[in-house]
């Protein structure tokens, strides 16, 4: 974050993410943007800040390129585990190449998990893996599990690059519609299918079609609940991360338009890797790059005057490990003040 006070007018919004910390109803926070703009660093840092004001925080990576382990210098897997040095911040990395059946079963008792025990065995797994973008399916299954357990007060998602993220957020709507259609078809053809299945010895596990359909209806209700939560600005928000370059700005604009069309709240943008060369600097490349960045920063200000725009400086070291992440996270809530230009 940065020289916001210098660049913006007095009527602009705070150039920090403090509003997210103050929003006590917030349950889902998605952090996303183009690849290579600092999403993971930003999501880890935001989770650290949230852990200071909330009882329990879970950080989930839905990016197949999992970087949480690298960022914290600690190995994470598909089970949530505490981040070293914290007693209320946990992290996990969903493996899109793992078995979806394993993921759906991790909730323990199948009776508590509407997606587990549908009685479809390998067919359910085949169906899941036939969906374009299985990582979205895996991630969404984890969301469903968290909705049912409610064991964390707030969940932060370090998302995959833009396209995957938007498909993931669209997933509940698509799935809800598909299950509604399936339910409609089953009510029409259920009796006939039951008689056919009865003649063939029934379904695996001794379940009948009605039991499976009732579990699918329960699943549809849960998905509907998730959908409603994602579209509730009191519960869900999306933090856009970008750098001050044309392609990143273009991607951010497209993402915000799509989020708006999905009715998902977004009002914060983090602009990373900003240069602030001093006025006596002899680095001509730095000055030229700063000039270009200023141009795109001005565009961001014009386009998103009702957003909290956070300006983060380019650092001389990688942000890895708890101490550096904490230092970086402080700049998300206390604006970085650059040297005079």
UniProtKB/Swiss-Prot annotation:
Zinc recorded as keyword: yes
Chain positions recorded as ATP binding sites: 34-41, 245, 272
GO cellular component: GET complex
Job of this protein: ATPase required for the post-translational delivery of tail-anchored (TA) proteins to the endoplasmic reticulum. Recognizes and selectively binds the transmembrane domain of TA proteins in the cytosol. This complex then targets to the endoplasmic reticulum by membrane-bound receptors, where the tail-anchored protein is released for insertion. This process is regulated by ATP binding and hydrolysis. ATP binding drives the homodimer towards the closed dimer state, facilitating recognition of newly synthesized TA membrane proteins. ATP hydrolysis is required for insertion.
Its EC number(s): 3.6.-.-
Localisation per UniProt entry: Cytoplasm; Endoplasmic reticulum
InterPro entries (UniProt xref): Anion-transp_ATPase-like_dom, ATPase_ArsA/GET3, ATPase_ArsA/GET3_euk, P-loop_NTPase
GO biological process: one example: tail-anchored membrane protein insertion into ER membrane
Protein name (record): ATPase GET3
GO MF, any single term: ATP hydrolysis activity
